[in-house]
C-alpha cells in the first residue's frame, strides 16, 4: 500500500528552466501528482463535475464519454504545489473494456458519483465498489461518495438519509452538489480539495467506524437516460 499511496513526481521548471543557487544551478522543483478516478453510471454528471473543478465552470456542451476523459489542475496546499489528475471513464460497459486496466493503474483516490434524480444510479454503486475490489484497489485508498444534480429538487429520488447510511456503511464522506449550478461551485471544490488534503497528509477522511445497521444495495436494471452530463 505504501507504494500505491506514493504520488507521482514530475519536473516543474521555472521560466528560465532551472533555479540558480550558491553552488550553481539547482535541480528543478518537483510537484506531486495524485490520480483520482471518478466512477459511476452514464449520465450521472461525472464529466461535468471534473470540468467544473478544473475549468471553474459548467461545460458549454456535454456528450457521452467514450473511453476515458482526463483533466488536471494544479493546487497549492500548505505551500506545496500539487497536481490533481481526474480520470473520468465511460459508464457504459462497451466503452470501458479496452481501457479499464489502464484506468485503475496507480490510483490514489476514488470518487463514486450517482444521480440524485435517478434511483437506479444509486443502486448501481455496489457494482462500482465491487469493480474497484476486482482491480485490487486497497481498502484504505480514500473514497468519497457524491450525489450530483441536487439543484433538481422536485425530481430528487435518493433521499439524503439513505445516501448517508450507504456512505457510513462504506466509510465514505457524502457530498451532495450540482455541477451545473454556479452556487454549488464551492461544494464541488470541496470534494476534490478534501481528497487533495487527505492525500497530502495521509490522514483518514473518516475516523468513526461504520454503524452496524448499515444498508446493503443490490444492482437494479438501469433505465434509459437522456442527459449526457
Curated annotation (Swiss-Prot):
It comes from Homo sapiens (Human). The keyword Protein transport applies. Regulated by guanine nucleotide exchange factors (GEFs) which promote the exchange of bound GDP for free GTP. Regulated by GTPase activating proteins (GAPs) such as SGSM2 which increase the GTP hydrolysis activity. Inhibited by GDP dissociation inhibitors (GDIs). It comes from the Eukaryota. This is Ras-related protein Rab-33B. Gene3D superfamilies: P-loop containing nucleotide triphosphate hydrolases (3.40.50.300). Switch 1, switch 2 and the interswitch regions are characteristic of Rab GTPases and mediate the interactions with Rab downstream effectors. The switch regions undergo conformational changes upon nucleotide binding which drive interaction with specific sets of effector proteins. Although most effectors only bind GTP-bound Rab, ATG16L1 effector binds both GTP- and GDP-bound RAB33B. It is a lipid-anchor. The lineage of its organism: Eukaryota, Metazoa, Chordata, Craniata, Vertebrata. The modification Cysteine methyl ester is found at residue 229. Its cofactor is Mg(2+). It is an enzyme of class 3 (hydrolase). The gene is RAB33B.
Amino acid at each position: 500500500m505504501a507504494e500505491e499511496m506514493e504520488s507521482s513526481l514530475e519536473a516543474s521548471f521555472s521560466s528560465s528552466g532551472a533555479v540558480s543557487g550558491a553552488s550553481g544551478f539547482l535541480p528543478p522543483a518537483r510537484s506531486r501528482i495524485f490520480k483520482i478516478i471518478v466512477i459511476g453510471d452514464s449520465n450521472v454528471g461525472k464529466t461535468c463535475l471534473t470540468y467544473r473543478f478544473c475549468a471553474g465552470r459548467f461545460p458549454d456542451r456535454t456528450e457521452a464519454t467514450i473511453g476515458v476523459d482526463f483533466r488536471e489542475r494544479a493546487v497549492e496546499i500548505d505551500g506545496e504545489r500539487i497536481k490533481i489528475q481526474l480520470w473520468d471513464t465511460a459508464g457504459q460497459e462497451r466503452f470501458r473494456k479496452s481501457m479499464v486496466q489502464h484506468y485503475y493503474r496507480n490510483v490514489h483516490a476514488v470518487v463514486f458519483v450517482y444521480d440524485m434524480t435517478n434511483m437506479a444510479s444509486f443502486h448501481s454503486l455496489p457494482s462500482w465498489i465491487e469493480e474497484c475490489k476486482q482491480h485490487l484497489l486497497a481498502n484504505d485508498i480514500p473514497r468519497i461518495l457524491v450525489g450530483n444534480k441536487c439543484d433538481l429538487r422536485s425530481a430528487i429520488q435518493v433521499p439524503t438519509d439513505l445516501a448517508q447510511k450507504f456512505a457510513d456503511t462504506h466509510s465514505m464522506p457524502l457530498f451532495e452538489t450540482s455541477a451545473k449550478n454556479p452556487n454549488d461551485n464551492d461544494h464541488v471544490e470541496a470534494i476534490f480539495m478534501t481528497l487533495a488534503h487527505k492525500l497530502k497528509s495521509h490522514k483518514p477522511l473518516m475516523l468513526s467506524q461504520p454503524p452496524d445497521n448499515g444498508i446493503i444495495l443490490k444492482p437494479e436494471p438501469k433505465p434509459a437516460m437522456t442527459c449526457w452530463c
